[in-house]
Amino acid sequence: MNRDKRFELIARANSERICGIAERILDDAATAVEVVKKPVCGMIMMRFRDTAEKCVFNIGEVLVTEAEVRIGSELGYAMVMGRDAEAALAGAIIDAAVESGHPLTPEIIDLLRSEEERLKEELQKTWAEVATTKVDFEVMA
């Protein structure tokens, strides 16, 4: 799993699951976690690509929380939507753990893959609900 994909999944993952594995990393006496940037809230511009003309435009600002940590020489970073300092810090810890080759890395990757599957299922469910509202203009004519 590449780092971009990991960032995306950490940002959208269930915060309880992310925080649980981050706690286990913190409990490991052999792993020293240094907080480089405490969780801070900020705003980012959410961008969207128009499906018809393929042009990008700004929808509006979104509240996010970001954090950065270091494990050994490896930096970990995470940004999550909303005001959730615990999830941002946990995400950064998980990212740094994977980058540093922490013993829990395989379990972290498994957790992120299961979150990816859950997110895909949620998206399919949403599309199925939206499909029932689709109007077929050919039939109406």
Predicted regions and their residues:
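Cysteine/selenocysteine-centered motifs that mediate thiol-based redox chemistry or coordinate metal-sulfur cofactors
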Residues: 29, 99-141
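Short, functionally important structural connectors and interaction interfaces within domains
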Residues: 2, 51-54, 127-129
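Structured beta-strand/loop patches that form or line metal/cofactor-binding pockets in enzymes
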Residues: 26-71, 77-78
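A generic short-segment signal for beta-strand/edge and adjacent turn/coil regions
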Residues: 1-4, 13, 33-40, 45-48, ...
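Charge-rich, low-complexity N-terminal segments
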Residues: 1-27
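A hydrophobic, small-residue-rich beta->alpha segment in the mid-to-C-terminal subdomain
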Residues: 74-110
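Short secondary-structure boundary micro-motifs
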Residues: 8, 17-19, 39, 50-54, ...
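A broadly conserved detector of short glycine/acidic/proline-rich loop/turn motifs that flank catalytic sites
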Residues: 49, 82, 141
